């Protein structure tokens, strides 16, 4: 891989302003000490069957060096620190795409400074396409594409279909240059290039350490980035990014703006906030309330007829009678009763028995209006107005003056949300008055008790049937 004359250099001073640069510098100081000839990690060439593995060291060597030279007492801490450095690509396993450190005999190799993250690499997809394409031209077992790399290559080939010929030519030229290198040098450079892309295009499921925290990025003195091509590709084949203009100088806020800021922060201070303990208690109570309705946690009653021989579920559906769990759920809140068709029907029957069903019928009519085709909306708005809100309406509802005036204005330009304010007002009235009366009513209690009795009778019949056999 051609490294050119900018070996280990940064572009346009971006490196000094990168939010991660402090971390990079600390890691590179440790790497420099690791590579010291006298006190560093011993690098050796290992003889394998019919081949040699040059310039490697083991994972246990790294852990022992960190414990000895960085005054680390816990081996787990040393392993964690080494894994972080490996994830940033400063050293890498020679036979694995996952950049992690293992405290064993796994072989590792140092990355060349040209590929260090402190050089502020931001490689393009075209660079990655050249690299993958070049790998397919080299008939080496160690250079075969992994599954995720093959998928990436196919995706890039579709994305850059018009300029794929040029990308192929670039890859072919790079492959010819690599063939002219010494065998050992080529093996080392291939592994270092692979490790570079494992950092910038990591294995699915691995963390991308090159991503910049948005909070850190906002504190940069110069927020614009300069993209840098790995292979020196020309602008005509690179993806065009928007030109970043210098940030304009900020002006001191005016008196009006300061007043607006003060008003905003006063509103924020007056906002109602819940303590985390209250939120946790609320979440726990919600979970305990709905746990029996989660089939992953509690077996459903009645059981799924497709998984068992019990046909009770089908019998209940055929009889149109709700199960005990279904009836019990209506008591959790008015939303539960309204979103269940049978619950709405029972709620409406109860209100009709008390001659106060107009509120619920209005609420249901507005819900139906929201789902109507747009051509039917104006006529349906007039029907709802004449039935519930017009002077002398047959089913007049009780609205406050503010909601009525706003609805009157909305009717002049009918739409799906003409009655939004009126519906919200009626919903609050039902939630505070009609719904509690329905839950306390004998109709709901009888329905709930009937389900329990039915369940008891069914269990008794099953018991007697089993005993008879």
UniProtKB/Swiss-Prot annotation:
Region (Disordered): 236-255
Tissue specificity note: Detected in brain (at protein level).
Locations listed in the record: Cytoplasm, Cytosol; Cytoplasm; Cell membrane; Membrane
Primary site of residence: cytoplasm
Maturation and modification: Palmitoylated. Ubiquitinated, leading to rapid proteasomal degradation.
Molecular functions (GO terms): G-protein alpha-subunit binding; G-protein beta-subunit binding; GTPase activator activity
Domain G protein gamma: 255-316
Positions of post-translational Phosphoserine modification: 229, 241, 434
GO cellular component labels: cell tip; cytosol; dendrite; dendrite terminus; glutamatergic synapse; nucleus; plasma membrane; postsynaptic membrane
Pfam families from the UniProt entry: DEP, G-gamma, RGS, RGS_DHEX
Lipoprotein among keywords: yes
UniProt domain DEP: residue ranges: 37-112
Keyword Repressor: no
Entry keywords, A to Z: Cell membrane, Cytoplasm, GTPase activation, Lipoprotein, Membrane, Palmitate, Phosphoprotein, Signal transduction inhibitor, Ubl conjugation
Residue spans crossing the bilayer: none
Domain RGS: 333-448
GO biological process, alphabetically ordered: G protein-coupled receptor signaling pathway; intracellular signal transduction; negative regulation of G protein-coupled receptor signaling pathway; regulation of G protein-coupled receptor signaling pathway; regulation of postsynaptic membrane potential
Membrane topology: Peripheral membrane protein
Residues making up the signal peptide according to the UniProt record: none
Quaternary structure and interacting proteins, as annotated: Interacts with GNB5, forming the RGS7-GNB5 complex. Interacts with GPR158; promotes the GTPase activator activity of the RGS7-GNB5 complex in absence of glycine, in contrast GTPase activator activity of the RGS7-GNB5 complex is inhibited in presence of glycine. Interacts with GPR179. Interacts with PKD1; this prevents rapid proteasomal degradation. Interacts with RGS7BP, leading to regulate the subcellular location of the heterodimer formed with GNB5. Interacts (phosphorylated form) with 14-3-3 protein YWHAQ. Interacts with SNAPIN. Interacts with GNAI1. Interacts with GNAO1, GNAI3 and GNAZ.
Protein task: GTPase activator component of the RGS7-GNB5 complex that regulates G protein-coupled receptor signaling cascades. The RGS7-GNB5 complex acts as an inhibitor signal transduction by promoting the GTPase activity of G protein alpha subunits, such as GNAO1, thereby driving them into their inactive GDP-bound form. May play a role in synaptic vesicle exocytosis. Glycine-dependent regulation of the RGS7-GNB5 complex by GPR158 affects mood and cognition via its ability to regulate neuronal excitability in L2/L3 pyramidal neurons of the prefrontal cortex.
Name under which the protein is recorded: Regulator of G-protein signaling 7
Organism: Mus musculus
Taxonomic lineage from the root: Eukaryota, Metazoa, Chordata, Craniata, Vertebrata
Gene name for this UniProt entry: Rgs7
């Amino acid at each position: 891989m051609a490294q050119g004359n900018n070996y280990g250099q940064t572009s346009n001073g971006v490196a000094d302003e990168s939010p991660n640069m402090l971390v990079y510098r600390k890691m590179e100081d440790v790497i420099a000490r690791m590579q010291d000839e006298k006190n560093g990690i011993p690098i050796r060439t290992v003889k394998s069957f019919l081949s040699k593995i040059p310039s490697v060291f083991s994972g246990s060597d790294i852990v022992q060096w960190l414990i000895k030279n960085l005054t680390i007492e816990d081996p787990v801490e040393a392993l964690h620190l080494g894994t972080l450095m490996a994830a940033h690509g400063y050293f890498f396993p020679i036979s694995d795409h996952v950049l992690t450190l293992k405290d064993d005999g796994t072989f590792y190799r140092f990355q060349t400074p040209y590929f260090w993250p402190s050089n502020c690499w931001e490689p393009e997809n075209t660079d990655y396409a050249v690299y993958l394409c070049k790998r397919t031209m080299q008939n080496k077992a160690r250079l075969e594409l992994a599954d995720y790399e093959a998928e990436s290559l196919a995706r890039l080939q579709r994305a850059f279909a018009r300029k794929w010929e040029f990308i192929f030519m670039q890859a072919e030229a790079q492959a010819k240059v690599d063939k002219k290198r010494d065998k050992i040098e080529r093996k080392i450079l291939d592994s270092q290039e692979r490790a570079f892309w494992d950092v910038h295009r990591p294995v699915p499921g691995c963390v991308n350490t090159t991503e910049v925290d948005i909070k850190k990025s906002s504190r940069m003195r110069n927020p614009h980035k300069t993209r840098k091509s790995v292979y020196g590709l020309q602008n005509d084949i690179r993806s065009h990014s928007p030109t970043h203009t210098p940030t304009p100088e900020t002006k001191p806020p005016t008196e009006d703006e300061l007043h607006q800021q003060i008003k905003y922060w006063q509103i924020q201070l007056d906002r109602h906030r819940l303590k985390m303990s209250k939120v946790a208690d609320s979440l726990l109570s919600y979970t305990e309330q709905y746990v029996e309705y989660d089939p992953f946690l509690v077996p459903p009653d009645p059981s799924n007829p497709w998984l068992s021989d019990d046909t009770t579920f089908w019998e209940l559906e055929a009889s149109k009678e709700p199960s005990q769990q279904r009836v019990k759920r209506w008591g959790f809140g008015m939303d539960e009763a309204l979103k269940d068709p049978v619950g709405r029907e029972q709620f409406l029957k109860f209100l009709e028995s008390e001659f106060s069903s107009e509120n619920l019928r209005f609420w249901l009519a507005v819900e139906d209006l929201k789902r109507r085709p747009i051509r039917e909306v104006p006529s349906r708005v007039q029907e709802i107005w004449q039935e519930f809100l017009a002077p002398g309406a047959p089913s007049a509802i009780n609205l406050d003056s503010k909601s009525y005036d706003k609805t009157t204005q909305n009717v002049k330009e009918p739409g799906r949300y003409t009655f939004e304010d009126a519906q919200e007002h009626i919903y609050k009235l039902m939630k505070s008055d009609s719904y509690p009366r329905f839950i306390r009513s004998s109709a709901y209690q009888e329905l709930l008790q009937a389900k329990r009795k039915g369940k008891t009778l069914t269990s008794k019949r099953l018991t007697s049937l089993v005993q008879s056999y």
